[in-house]
């Protein structure tokens, strides 16, 4: 039976670059909301020698995620899931929409794919270094736990927290940071839950990356660039390689942690470049 790698948000950016770093003997399934973008990415992967398929999926819809998991499992044994689907504050949408896609979408992906995965497989949830700059008083893990038991209360409480910011963009920024802080927490929780099934779970937090989404955030997120070790944005291919490496089965002892891949900007801001 062939091994299958699923990448949500795989039609472009770091998700597509991660697909290009996977072994060519794997079947690659990329998903997203725009079929034309996915089809273009599939053609690009096929030209490189991959057996690749496109499947539309809205990760904020559990049934859509379930259909993706079922489809992937019909192609072979699902060994790698890289959940890179997400939205940022600069994109169209509301605070609740950001939380539904980034936070609840992660819950749906982890829960539905864990049902079709076997020992020796891995889920990599993509977070963001914005998870590390969130004021501590906004972080409430009891609220995070509601994501699995009471979704609407979970959303209402996090939207309320994000409303503490002034201005629409800032409120969306708080919602984004909350959603990504949740992803880090939830991936760790799943690591210990799914570890009993032999499924490894890790999160990876990029910094500002030169993708379409990253460029939208450059005006505000760019403030962190001077704090990075090389004082630059990350490149999609660098993050793609990092994701593929973390998702590699040979990295079997890497679980229950967040891999901070932001050029050192979080460390620089907190410890070494405070005067910049």
Features from the language model and the residues they span:
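Conserved NAD(P)H cofactor-binding loop of Rossmann-fold oxidoreductase domains
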Residues: 84-89, 264
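Catalytic loop of short-chain dehydrogenase/reductase
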Residues: 88-91, 122-196, 208
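Conserved glycine-rich Rossmann-like NAD(P)H-binding loop of the short-chain dehydrogenase/reductase
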Residues: 25-40
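Rossmann-fold cofactor-recognition segment
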Residues: 45-63
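Conserved glycine-rich cofactor-binding loop
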Residues: 9-13
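C-terminal helical subdomain
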Residues: 108, 175-176, 203, 220-254, ...
């Amino acid at each position: 039976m062939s091994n299958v790698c699923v990448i949500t948000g795989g039609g472009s950016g770091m998700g597509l670059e991660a697909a290009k770093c996977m072994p060519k003997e794997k079947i690659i399934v990329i998903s997203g909301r725009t079929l034309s973008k996915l089809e273009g990415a599939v053609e690009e992967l096929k030209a490189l020698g991959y057996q690749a398929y496109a499947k539309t999926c809205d990760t904020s819809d559990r049934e859509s995620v379930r259909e993706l998991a079922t489809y992937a499992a019909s192609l072979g044994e699902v060994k790698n899931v890289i959940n890179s689907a997400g939205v940022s504050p600069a994109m169209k949408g509301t605070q609740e929409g950001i939380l539904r896609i980034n936070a609840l979408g992660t819950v749906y992906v982890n829960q539905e794919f864990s049902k079709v995965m076997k020992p020796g497989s891995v889920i990599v949830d993509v977070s963001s270094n914005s998870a590390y700059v969130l004021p501590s008083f906004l972080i409430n893990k009891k609220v995070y736990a509601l994501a699995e038991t009471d979704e609407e209360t979970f959303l209402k409480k996090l939207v309320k927290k994000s409303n503490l910011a002034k201005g629409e963009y800032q409120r969306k920024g708080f919602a984004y940071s909350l959603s990504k802080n949740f992803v880090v927490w939830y991936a760790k929780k799943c690591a210990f839950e799914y570890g009993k099934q032999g499924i490894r779970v890790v999160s990876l937090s990029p910094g500002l990356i030169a993708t379409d989404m990253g460029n939208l955030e450059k005006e505000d997120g760019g403030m962190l660039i001077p704090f990075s070790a090389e004082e630059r944005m990350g490149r999609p291919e660098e993050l793609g390689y990092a994701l593929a490496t973390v998702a590699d089965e040979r990295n079997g002892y890497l679980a229950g942690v967040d891999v901070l891949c932001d050029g050192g900007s979080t460390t620089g801001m907190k410890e070494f470049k405070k005067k910049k």
